[in-house]
Every structure is written in structure tokens, then in C-alpha cells.
Amino acid sequence: MRKLFLALLLLAVALPFNAAFADSIIASNAGGHAAFNVIPFGSLFGDGRYQEVYSSSLFTGPVEITSLAFSPQDTTTYAANVDLRLTTTNVGVGNLTSNLDNNFSIPLTDVYSNPNFSQNVTGGSETFSLVFTLTNPFIYDPSQGNLLLDLVISNQNQNEAFSRSGAGNILSRAYNSAGFGDGADGVGLRTEIGYNSVPEPGTLVMLGTGFLTLAGAVRRRLM
């Protein structure tokens, strides 16, 4: 009984600590929604590859990225063959080139792949209802550079457009596509990035010390 009480007490302390670290942020250039755009999720884009760079200023410390979400124009069922990869890059926002392999030096990390991806989405510039929950969450440290998304896509089932922002200093894009050729510019898809904050080592030490102190106090009371 004493062991059960102690375990439940420690769990009650740990759960609020963990929950406080789950969050999301909207990556968008100033001005918010500017237009709906079919690059890269629309069928007119065709088979292709798309990159988007996000400024490191979005985050104040290391995070574990758990999801990426985008806002479609229409309420529909969207399907495609998708592969998402992430990495850190020293290439700045607005400086991506259409030679996509030159936009990073750290190898890409596979975070989500589904040849038969299909999802019901809700239309609207602020819905962020097309959600890719990463099967391999990505640890990102903003002190090491900007965040780069690399998407390979094909077999889009419709020419669906998604919310993009105008040019700015938070995000930009580059692409190679069958439908639009190669390009790079200062705009990009507005993205909701889901993440868990990664505690600093000192925080973990303090938490561990607190647990030990609490355990000792409870043990003395139960003796």
C-alpha cells in the first residue's frame, strides 16, 4: 500500500511537468494569410520535391518536433504519396535555391512517410487541418541553424490549395516540380509546428532532486 501511494504521488507530480512542455506555434511571415496556393500539395504541382525553411527565431531553445500542419482552402478528403524529412541548415530565410541539395549540409532525417496518405480536412486559412503527425519526432536545436522541411510528393488526388503568407523573414520556399518547373521565392506555406520542449540538463537535475526529496519525506511519514 505504501509503495502504491508513493508511486501515485510521484506520478501526480510528474504529469503536470510533462504536460507543460507540449505546445505548438504558427510559422508565418508578417501579415498572416495572403493567398491559397497549390504548391506543393495540388495536383498541378505534379510529382516533385518541395523545401521550406523556418527561422530559428521561432524557438527559444531545443524542441522535439512532433507534427506539421497546413490549412487547406476546401473541406475535402485529401490524398497523396508523401515523404517528409527535416534537418537543420545555415541557409537563411529567403536564400533557398532551386538546387535543393545545396540548401543543406546535415543529412535529412526521415520523419514521416506514407504512400497512401489520406485525410479529411476542413477548409479555412486558420484550420491547420492537414496534419502530419511525425512517426519519427525530430530534435531541433535553434542555436545550430534554421529548420528545413524537405517534402517529396506525388499522386495528389486533387488540385487543393493551402494557405501561404507573403514574403518575410520567418519562412520561404524552393521546389522542383513536374508542373511548375524549378523555383525559389520568399513566400511559403503557413505551418503549425507541434513540439515538445526539451528540458535543459539543469532542469532535469532539479526535477530528479525534487523527486528524491519528496520520496524521502513520504517514506518517513509512512514509517
Please identify what each model-predicted range represents:
Residues 19-45:
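Boundary/junction segments of secreted and surface-exposed precursor proteins
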Residues 63-74, 149:
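A short beta-strand element within beta-rich, extracytoplasmic domains
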Residues 2-8, 203-204:
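Sec-dependent signal peptide recognition
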Residues 199-218:
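A short, hydrophobic C-terminal helix/tail in secreted or cell-surface proteins
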Residues 28-29, 146-197:
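Proprotein-processing/basic-patch segments
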Residues 77-169:
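Aromatic- and Gly/Pro-enriched, solvent-exposed loop/edge beta-strand patches characteristic
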Residues 7-16:
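Bacterial N-terminal signal peptides
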Residues 1-4, 219-223:
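Positively charged n-region of N-terminal signal peptides that target proteins for export
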